[in-house]
Amino acid sequence: MKRIFLNKLNRDFKLELCKVNKEVVCSIPKSCLSSLTRSLTEIDKMEIVINKYITGLDGKTVLNPLWKEVKEERLVCLNDSEYFVIKINNFKSSENELSVTAYSLEYKLGKIDIALEDIYFYLMTSDEDSYIYNLNDYMYSETGWKFGHIDDSVRYDITDEGKEDKLRLFSSVDKRWYDFLTEDIAETFNCLVVFDTLNKIVLLYDVNSVSENIQIYLSHDNYIKSLERTSSTDDIVTRMTLVGNEEMDIIGSVVTGYPYIEDYSYFANNKEMSENLISALNKYNQMVATRQPIWENLIKLKSEKLETSTMRKNELFVIYEEIRALKSIKESYAFNGDTKNEVLVMAQITEKLDQQVLLEIEIKELEEELIQIQDSIDNINLLCKRETATDENGNLIFNTKTLDELKEFIYCETYSNDSFLNVKDLIEAGKRELGLSCYPSVSYTLDVKNFMSRIMVENFRLQWQGDIGLGDIVILRDDDINEDVLLYLTDYVQKPNEDEENSLEITLSNKKYKDKNIRTIADKLREGSTAMKKLTMKSYVFNNVKYNRINITKEQIGGNI
């Protein structure tokens, strides 16, 4: 993985102003760089301040040559390794300076539309005979970007038998490419999307493989100047209903038989529940975990028996048709008085009838076995439902009081994704989303004393050496709650031209990745706007239906439609 990690917070930056085609126009003094914001999941941002006038070599005040060259949509090349696109120029006449905001080049993907309707994709390969297309080729043709490194666990479904490309269905997509990559692709392939703006390459990393090293202990005694903590339970979820495509059976794919999954660990760990309820939940989870493998084996056995039964029924259908055809042939021979051939055909019919009997017996036995297997599955489902769940001694785990108390901790949300073709993939994705949502979001914004000035030159093994990365774990001493908190480094802002005491701000969060599935008002407005545009485009259809269906006149319809 390249350059996710902050190997050092250096102050030596090389800035070049470029045209849209990346042709270099001129250099930008590093003193103009006001701030550089890096984030694990958001678009990186650069702030540049350019003075209108500068002092020339002769000591006279002259117009800054950069002044007329800095234009929107031009690029800034940073350290010959990445590009930022200029989006905002803010001129302050009172200060005779231009404040420039530039975003990492993938920002432009947020201005390119993608619309898909019932399209199957592999990431890097295709099977067009089966109408499965190559997303890499399609992305390159539409945007000029292509995939680079992809972790095997992202690209492939890996089993004991080997690996095969993951297949995803995108049934209704109408958004921008940046959102499609950072939301749909990141979610359905369980990956972190990283953009190489120098080469216009998209890198996909398994979310579980990205830097989780414990790197540094922060407290007011060493690096912290000031600390602000924000916590919120607005989006907390303990029960998540899973909705896939129409062909997916969620209820039949989970041992509890519920259309949802649950996680009450936050309230249990904080002792907000009674001891009786906590004990019941722990025992319930233990018994579900014990019964899960038994249930999975029964489901597998049922699938095998169903497959065998289907094969035998197909064979029996063929036998029925063969017997019918042979009887017709026999009647023809009998009509023509061909006794010899009639006897031969009779022997064939007898043989087929014997096969028919054997198949009917086997099918009946399979159906009886399937009924028994289904009864066992239903019994385990019953034992895994809260109201009827029992412990190893057959005693009910929950009583009316604990069940009523549990209702106080239900916070529902629906996770919907029709891209998955395998219900297990949908359930795993739902578990990841619930894992992000089942406890409050807590973030810390810190002003930090510059790390680099505190690093000792000697390579003493207990001394922090200055390596820290987005996604790394930081142990934070929060004196207000008198606890050491383990948090992820998710964002940082570097101000290279400030003094060391003010040159770095970092954001820490108990959630490594932000939950992108919580719908905001802006999302709803955008979806509504798109729907209205489509409705307007097809308005003639509705008008025809309204006034001309089945040759009924407008007067006959009246004003009720």
Name what the model sees in each region.
Residues 1-2, 87-109, 153-247:
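Short beta-strand-centered interaction patches in the first periplasmic/extracellular domains
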Residues 22-23, 30-36, 111-135, 153-183:
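Short acidic/polar beta-strand-loop edge motifs in secreted extracellular
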Residues 31, 110-127, 203-286, 522:
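Surface-exposed, non-catalytic interaction/assembly patches
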Residues 61-77, 463-478:
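Short coil-to-beta transition motif at edge beta-strands of beta-rich domains
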Residues 73-103, 194-196, 222-225, 475-497:
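Short beta-strand and beta-hairpin "edge-sheet" elements
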Residues 100-102, 116, 251-443, 447-561:
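Acidic, low-complexity/disordered segments
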